[in-house]
C-alpha cells in the first residue's frame, strides 16, 4: 500500500462540478449512479497511455465538517492494497481512525475510509471480484 489509485471529489452539485472539470481539464465521465446508489460519475482524466489516475465526482454527504460519520469537503485519495485487513491494522496502529468501515463493492472490491492523524480522509481499496 503506497500509491494512490483513485480520487473522489465531493460536490454539493455534481452536475455543476462535472461541467467545471470537463471545461477546465477536458475530463469525460461514466455514470455509476446506479451502482453507487447516489450521484457518482467516474472520471476519465486522460488517455491510459499517459501518467495519472482516474477517479470520480460524487454527491457530498450531509453534515458540517470532516470526521467519523461526517461529510468530506474536498478530494479524497484512495490507496490500493492487496491485503485490506493487514493495512487496516497498520493504519490503526499508526494512529489512524476508521471514518467509514470496510464494505463490499459487490463483485468489485472491498472499500473503507480512514482519518489520518491530522483529520484528513483517505480511502483503502482491495480489488476482489468475489466481494459481497
Provide a role label for each language-model segment.
Residues 1-19, 74-79, 126-132:
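N-terminal beta-strand motif that seeds the catalytic metal site of vicinal oxygen chelate
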Residues 2, 50-52, 70-74:
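Short connector loops at helix/strand junctions that flank enzyme active sites
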Residues 8-52:
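Core segments of cupin and vicinal oxygen chelate
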Residues 9, 30-32, 88-132:
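Vicinal oxygen chelate
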Residues 39-41, 75, 108-112:
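Short beta-strand micro-motifs in enzyme catalytic cores
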Residues 52-59:
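A short, structured beta-strand/loop element
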Residues 59-67, 132:
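A short, acidic/glycine-rich surface segment
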Residues 65-94:
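Mid-chain, well-packed structural core segment of small domains
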Amino acid at each position: 500500500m503506497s500509491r494512490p489509485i483513485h480520487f473522489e471529489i465531493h460536490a454539493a452539485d455534481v452536475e455543476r462540478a462535472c461541467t467545471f472539470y470537463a471545461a477546465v481539464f477536458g475530463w469525460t465521465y461514466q455514470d455509476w449512479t446506479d451502482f453507487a446508489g447516489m450521484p457518482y460519475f467516474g472520471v476519465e482524466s486522460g488517455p491510459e497511455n499517459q501518467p495519472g489516475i482516474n477517479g470520480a465526482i460524487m454527491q457530498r454527504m450531509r453534515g458540517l465538517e470532516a470526521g467519523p460519520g461526517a461529510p468530506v469537503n474536498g478530494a479524497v485519495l484512495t490507496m490500493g492494497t492487496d491485503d485490506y485487513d493487514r493495512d487496516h491494522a497498520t493504519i490503526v496502529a499508526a494512529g489512524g481512525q476508521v471514518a467509514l468501515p470496510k464494505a463490499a463493492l459487490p463483485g468489485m472490491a472491498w472499500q473503507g475510509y480512514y482519518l489520518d492523524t491530522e483529520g484528513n480522509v483517505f480511502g483503502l481499496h482491495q480489488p476482489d471480484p468475489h466481494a459481497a
